[in-house]
Amino acid sequence: MAAGAPLANYLAAKRIGNMLYMSGVIAVDPAARKVVTSYSDLPLEAQTQLKTLGYVTGQMSVDIFEAPAAAQSWFVLNRIKDIVEAEGGQMKDVFKLVQYFRDLRHYPAYNRVRGLFCPEPVVSTVVEVSRMLPSDEVMIEVEATAFLQA
């Protein structure tokens, strides 16, 4: 998926020496300018990865409840991966994540998906917030910091 421009007047990321600081990433498809809310909003690769975690069951009565948090988690973490790789790094270079949730009950799904991108523990802060831009459909926002080898 294309990186797209930030939704407001800010930088998506800033590299200073070997440090890469990323603004909070949310699950908005930049091409469609739409919040990711279902598995069908993700590429097939993502759906396949999520199936390995027990998501994307094909059962509407299950997927309708699990999809928003799992899909947004994958989208956000994959976007962070894309930003890091564009700067010549890898996800293993990400050492700190600050994760914002509209409802902490979404954390378990996010944590399972995070394991696909960060198999080793990282420095982590988790915060529950009341709202996020651009709409109430946004459930998860993650900012990341990476140390990139020259």
Regions found by a protein language model. Give the residues of each.
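Short, polar/acidic, helix-capping and beta-turn segments at strand->helix junctions
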Residues: 1-150
